[in-house]
Swiss-Prot record:
A motif (NPA 2) lies at residues 215-217. It catalyses: glycerol(in) = glycerol(out); H2O(in) = H2O(out); urea(in) = urea(out); H2O2(out) = H2O2(in). This is Aquaporin-3. The keyword Chaperone does not apply.
Length: 292
C-alpha cells in the first residue's frame, strides 16, 4: 500500500501543471463537459424515446443539476464560469483579467464539443435508428436538437434575439447577486446549488421559444460537433441561420445584466458593520482592564 501511494504521489507530481491559467482552462473544459453531457443526455432520452422517458421538466431538472455538478467540479480551480457570457461579465466588472475571456471561451467550447461527442457515442445506435439511418436536423424525426438549440416555428429572429438577451441578462443578475459578498451572500458551499436553481427557473419559465441556450459555448460546441458528425452545414442554416443568435445575444445580455445589477443594487451596497460578537469581545476586554 505504501509503495502504491508513493507511486501515485510521484505520478501526480509529474503530471502537475504549474501554469495556473492552463489549470483553470482544464477545469472550465471539464465542468462544461459535465454540463453538456448530462444536459444533452436528458434531451436525448426525451427525443429518442418520443417522450416516454421524460419530458420538458426532466430536461430542465437535468440542466439545473448539471450546472450544479459542473460548478462543484471546477469551482475551486477556475471559478466555474462554464459560460462565456459569465466570463465576459466578470471581465467587464474587472473581477477577472481580460486574458481569461478567450482562454475560458475556448476551453468551455471544447468541453461542450466533447460532451456532445460523448452523448452521440452513448446513443449512437438509437440516433441512427430513430429516423431510419438518417441524421435529420429538424422536423418530427430531427435529432440535431438533442445537441444544440433551434427556434420554434412561431419564433422570428427579433423575438428570438430578445429571448436569448433576456434569459442571459436574468442569469447574470442572479449570478452577481449570489457571488456578491455585500448582498446577503449564499452560505459557503451552496453557491453551486443556487446557480443550478437559477438555471432551472430560467428553463421552466423561458425555455419554450428556443430552448434557452443563454450560453454561447453550450450551443456552439455541440452545434459544431453535429456539423462534423454527419448532420452537415444545415445545422448552421436552419431557422434562418439561427446559429449566431445564441452566440451574440447572450454576450449583449451579459452586459445588460451587469448594468442592471450594478445600477440598481451593486453600486448602492455598503460593507456590513462590524459584527456584534467582535464588539462584545472588545467591550468585555475593556471592562476587564478597568476592574484590574
Amino acid at each position: 500500500m505504501g509503495r502504491q501511494k508513493e507511486l501515485v504521489n510521484r505520478c501526480g507530481e509529474m503530471l502537475h501543471i504549474r501554469y495556473r491559467l492552463l489549470r483553470q482552462a482544464l477545469a472550465e473544459c471539464l465542468g462544461t463537459l459535465i454540463l453538456v453531457m448530462f444536459g444533452c443526455g436528458s434531451v436525448a432520452q426525451v427525443v429518442l424515446s418520443r417522450g416516454t422517458h421524460g419530458g420538458f421538466l426532466t430536461i430542465n431538472l437535468a440542466f439545473g443539476f448539471a450546472v450544479t455538478l459542473g460548478i462543484l467540479i471546477a469551482g475551486q480551480v477556475s471559478g466555474a464560469h462554464l459560460n462565456p457570457a459569465v466570463t465576459f461579465a466578470m471581465c467587464f466588472l474587472a473581477r477577472e483579467p481580460w486574458i481569461k475571456l478567450p482562454v475560458y471561451t475556448l476551453a468551455q467550447t471544447l468541453g461542450a464539443f466533447l460532451g456532445a461527442g460523448i452523448i452521440f457515442g452513448l446513443y449512437y445506435d438509437a440516433i441512427w435508428a430513430f429516423a431510419n439511418n438518417q441524421l435529420i436536423v429538424s422536423g418530427p424525426n430531427g435529432t440535431a436538437g438533442i445537441f444544440a438549440t433551434y427556434p420554434s416555428g412561431h419564433l422570428d429572429m427579433v423575438n428570438g434575439f430578445f429571448d436569448q438577451f433576456i434569459g442571459t441578462a436574468s442569469l447574470i443578475v442572479c449570478v452577481l447577486a449570489i457571488v456578491d459578498p455585500y448582498n446577503n451572500p449564499v452560505p459557503r458551499g451552496l453557491e453551486a446549488f443556487t446557480v443550478g436553481l437559477v438555471v432551472l427557473v430560467i428553463g421552466t419559465s423561458m425555455g419554450f421559444n428556443s430552448g434557452y441556450a443563454v450560453n454561447p459555448a453550450r450551443d456552439f460546441g455541440p452545434r459544431l460537433f453535429t456539423a462534423i458528425a454527419g448532420w452537415g452545414s444545415e445545422v448552421f442554416t436552419t431557422g434562418r441561420h439561427w446559429w449566431w443568435v445564441p452566440i451574440v445575444s447572450p454576450l449583449l445580455g451579459s452586459i445588460a445584466g451587469v448594468f442592471v445589477y450594478q445600477l440598481m443594487i451593486g453600486c448602492h451596497l455598503e460593507p456590513p458593520p462590524p459584527s456584534t460578537d467582535e464588539e462584545n469581545v472588545k467591550l468585555s476586554h475593556v471592562k476587564h482592564k478597568e476592574q484590574m
